[in-house]
Amino acid sequence: MRNHILTASSLADALGKGHFKTQLDLMIAKTSTEEAPFISNNIIEWGVKYEPIATSFYEKMNHLKIVEFGLVPHPKLTIFGASPDGICDLDSPTDYVGRMLEIKCPPIRKFTKEVPYHYWIQMQGQLETCDLEECDFLQVKLFEYDSDDRYNEDISYN
């Protein structure tokens, strides 16, 4: 389904403000009659690997539970959908109920105080699709130790 609809994550590309595809490449991909295979890369795999850890961190930090929904079709625009990373459930503190969460775990991108514009566009598409008003943008920098010795060095109190 995702191959033939515009999703919030590709909205910035559609507007010519993205970093991943040109408008022409996106149009060709979305209008092709063939199913395009999903092409992963190291950055995507890193995010998939660490997003659950970031979600758990957010849940514990804010004393709430995040619910995942997968691809949510827009209620009116049949050619649009969004896959938010999660939405705070009804048992969350009152000021968090219905708040959306967008997570990025970039292995190499530098963090800034502002949400990168192409991600802000993505979040606006997600909020519109889900008819919500707020979205927290969580960036998490994680790294892996290459050895037990390196880890032990890092945690020693000497």
Predicted segments with their positions:
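Nucleic-acid nuclease catalytic cores
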Residues: 60-84, 88-158
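Charged, glycine-rich intrinsically disordered N-terminal tails and low-complexity linkers that flank
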Residues: 1-49, 53, 144-146
